[in-house]
């Protein structure tokens, strides 16, 4: 039997992708914080 916990890339990108983050001021803060911290991946 297959599990239902697959994870859909479209949903993931839409909610926590780079462009989704840039859309809101708080999302921009997230990107800014991750840049400052030196994260290799800024978003999903």
UniProtKB/Swiss-Prot annotation:
<dbReference type="InterPro" id="IPR000271">
    <property type="entry name" value="Ribosomal_bL34"/>
</dbReference>
<dbReference type="Pfam" id="PF00468">
    <property type="entry name" value="Ribosomal_L34"/>
</dbReference>
<keyword id="KW-0687">Ribonucleoprotein</keyword>
<dbReference type="GO" id="GO:0005840">
    <property type="term" value="C:ribosome"/>
</dbReference>
<protein>
    <recommendedName>
        <fullName>Large ribosomal subunit protein bL34</fullName>
    </recommendedName>
</protein>
<dbReference type="GO" id="GO:0006412">
    <property type="term" value="P:translation"/>
</dbReference>
<feature type="compositionally biased region" description="Basic residues">
    <location>
        <begin position="1"/>
        <end position="22"/>
    </location>
</feature>
<dbReference type="InterPro" id="IPR020939">
    <property type="entry name" value="Ribosomal_bL34_CS"/>
</dbReference>
<feature type="compositionally biased region" description="Basic residues">
    <location>
        <begin position="31"/>
        <end position="44"/>
    </location>
</feature>
<dbReference type="GO" id="GO:1990904">
    <property type="term" value="C:ribonucleoprotein complex"/>
</dbReference>
<keyword id="KW-0689">Ribosomal protein</keyword>
<feature type="region of interest" description="Disordered">
    <location>
        <begin position="1"/>
        <end position="44"/>
    </location>
</feature>
<dbReference type="GO" id="GO:0003735">
    <property type="term" value="F:structural constituent of ribosome"/>
</dbReference>
<comment type="similarity">
    <text>Belongs to the bacterial ribosomal protein bL34 family.</text>
</comment>
């Amino acid at each position: 039997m297959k599990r239902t916990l697959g994870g859909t890339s479209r949903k993931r990108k839409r909610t926590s992708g780079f462009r989704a983050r840039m859309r809101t001021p708080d999302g921009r803060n997230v990107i800014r914080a991750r840049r400052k911290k030196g994260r290799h991946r800024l978003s999903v």
